[in-house]
Amino acid sequence: MTFRKNLLALAALSIFATAAQAADITVSAAASLTNAFKEIAEKYQAKYPDAKVQLNFGASGALLQQMSKGAPVDLFASADQATMDKAEKQDLIDPKTRHNFVQNSLVLIVPSDSTLQLTKLADLKKADVKKVAIGNPASVPVGAYTQATLEAAHLWKAVSAKAVNTQNVRQSLDYVARGEVDAGFVYG
């Protein structure tokens, strides 16, 4: 995990430097990348003490909307390729500066004090699983990936009936951490 973190930091620092040449920079990034980009921003500011990094986190679709309405953004990092493609088609990003430098993996989590035994996706159909945090599939990449995964396993209908739709992956994490849901789909 440390290697991946260092690789991400190195890649993003080089992208920050390319985008800003040691100047102030505004970053809009998927909520799932919050911790990584906070760390990257600290390293960038340590390297360039006179520069300021403004971080804006949210659902990838919401960030794209902000950009399309004129929000100033120097660096955009979506949680999915589809949103990056839309940004490119809308001329909101320069295709020559687009770099893929990180990848998310969909994981199912439960509260730390949970006694549920969830070892396979089909376990989500169990009666004792009442609520499952799922990003809104219409606007949140983790939700779209979750829906596709559950549809492929023929579980979407059963699990979506238990869904608590969230605005981003951080909200799903919070619901699980507080025990407000029995399980949640996030990135790992």
Feature names for model-found ranges:
Residues 12, 22-48, 52-61, 65-69, ...:
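Exported/periplasmic ABC-transporter solute-binding proteins
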Residues 1-3:
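N-terminal secretory signal peptides that target proteins for export/translocation
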Residues 6-17:
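Bacterial N-terminal signal peptides
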